[in-house]
């Protein structure tokens, strides 16, 4: 049996663009992708902090250090430019592996520049908070 577990997330990024006419997906700054462990074309779940919507799509790499968070295609209807979003990816683990999984948390400023990369520890606390 495999268990779906959080692998990493980009916390409270700001949506910078929305392109309804694009084929689909979310474009994410490549620096943020690498820091959170998100791969190009990987499925992600997005939670809009402003309106509570949750939706899934796949990722396209955006220019490194550009701060881009662009909702493409139908996902452009799920959040507005300026909204804060949480972008999460998941992995499947065997139960014993899952007990020791510690997801990456990528924190950004209002321009989506990486400010900190930490791991979750016990009880949802970040490593630095223990």
From Swiss-Prot:
EC number(s) from the headed UniProt entry: 4.1.1.11
Function: Catalyzes the pyruvoyl-dependent decarboxylation of aspartate to produce beta-alanine.
The UniProt record lists the keyword Cytoplasm: yes
Post-translational modification Pyruvic acid (Ser), affected residues: 25
Catalytic center residues: 25 (schiff-base intermediate with substrate), 58 (proton donor)
Species this chain originates from: Lactiplantibacillus plantarum (strain ATCC BAA-793 / NCIMB 8826 / WCFS1)
Cofactor: binding comment: Binds 1 pyruvoyl group covalently per subunit.
NCBIfam families attached to this UniProt entry: panD
Pathway: Cofactor biosynthesis; (R)-pantothenate biosynthesis; beta-alanine from L-aspartate: step 1/1
Keywords annotated in UniProt: Autocatalytic cleavage, Cytoplasm, Decarboxylase, Lyase, Pantothenate biosynthesis, Pyruvate, Schiff base, Zymogen
One CC-aspect GO term: cytosol
Family under the similarity heading: Belongs to the PanD family.
Entry-linked Pfam families: Asp_decarbox (PF02261)
Co-factor(s): pyruvate
InterPro entries, alphabetized: Asp_de-COase-like_dom_sf, Asp_decarbox
GO MF term (any one): aspartate 1-decarboxylase activity
Name of the protein in its database record: Aspartate 1-decarboxylase
Catalytic reaction(s) noted: L-aspartate + H(+) = beta-alanine + CO2
The keyword Repressor belongs to this UniProt entry's keyword annotation: no
């Amino acid at each position: 049996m495999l268990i779906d577990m959080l692998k990493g997330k980009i916390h409270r990024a700001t949506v910078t663009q929305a392109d309804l006419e694009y084929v689909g997906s979310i474009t994410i700054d490549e620096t943020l992708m690498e820091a959170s462990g998100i791969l190009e074309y990987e499925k992600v779940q997005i939670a809009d902090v402003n309106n509570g919507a949750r939706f899934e799509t796949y990722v396209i790499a955006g220019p490194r250090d550009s701060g881009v968070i662009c909702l493409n295609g139908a996902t452009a209807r799920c959040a507005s430019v300026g909204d804060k979003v949480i972008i999460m990816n998941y992995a499947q683990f065997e139960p014993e592996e899952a007990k020791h999984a510690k997801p990456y948390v990528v924190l950004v400023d209002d321009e989506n520049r990486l400010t900190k990369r930490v791991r979750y520890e016990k009880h949802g606390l970040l490593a630095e908070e223990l």
